[in-house]
Amino acid sequence: VLNYLINDKKVCGNIDLVYIDPPYNTGGAFETRDFKLAYDDKYTTDGYLRFMRVRLKLLHTLLSEKGSIYVHLDSNMVFHVKILMDDIFGEKNFRGMITRKKCKSKNFTRKTYGNISDYILFYSKSDSAKWNRPYDQWDDEKVLKEYPFIEEGTGRRHKRVPCHAPGTRNGATGGPWRGMMPPEGKHWQYTPEKLDEMDAKGEIYWSSNGNPRRKVYLDQSKGVPVQDIWLDYLDVNNQNSCLTGYPTEKNLDMLKRIIETSSNPGDLVLDCFAGSGTTLVAAEELGRQWIGVDIGEEAIKIIQDRFVNGTKPIGDYVSRRKKKNDFASQSLFDLDFDDEKDTSNSQKTASKVQYQMFEEI
């Protein structure tokens, strides 16, 4: 399917964001909550890396110059795949690795720490990648700690920060202001004229010993800049929420954060391990165009049903069972991993609701 998209001039080089949640090398077989096989996650490390390399190279080609890719993995393969992505996307285009809390604390672990996290590798195709900085809202505890002062007369909550910054400068910011020089090895953050203007507006606080500090107001803050540890996006089956029944369904709000951060309304989003369709739903709700791909017949059925009927209340048990290799369904890793293989002539069959189904031949 990715080869098919590469041959589509309207798509190739025009995808603005890729999010994928590929198999994790767990050695297990994953079932839907009605015990149908979702996918078989069994492979050798070498086979898995060849599988991923082929797809990552195709995804790199499909991305626009302003595009980004997020790859969701666990500790089994995240560092192996990072080496692949450094090679394909370039080390300079590595933007970060997000650590996500995936489930509640465990008290039944083996002789190790409880495994409650997984990881998201974040790369861009170039330095011009789209980036809408995300912010969390202030909570009362953080507000009281970070903005402890109330301005007389206005009641505006604020904090007080130095008027200087590290490093020496030539010119006005390195010279005196009101008879004071900046501390050794530092410079004024603003010119003397700008500091006078701020002082006239009441934006400078003078301490009892005559030390000036700049007021930073809470009502001018966009929020708390998001860091690379995410604690609020547990998997759906670890929350009191609705789900599709797909065993590795991800958190809708997490996908919305990623999509809002690295794309704009009208942009094209791709998920080629679409699974439960969460990426597609998030993209639809945020006004993005989207393409979803999955090799699993059950995944396609779940996605179609989700768009028609939504999700269902949690309650049924979703299992992951390790089984012998006796499945009638084909494993993801039974495919040919040859880099040079061209699957652009895949046989297409029509689907029921604005979908195209592709069959490997």
Feature roles, as predicted:
Residues I120, Y147, W188, K215, ...:
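Short non-domain terminal segments
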Residues V1-L268, I300:
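Class I S-adenosyl-L-methionine
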Residues T45, V78, N251-D326:
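Conserved S-adenosyl-L-methionine
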Residues M77-F79, F89, L121, K256, ...:
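Low-complexity, compositionally biased segments
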Residues N107, D294-I361:
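Cysteine-dependent PTP/DSP-like catalytic domain, specifically the C-terminal lobe
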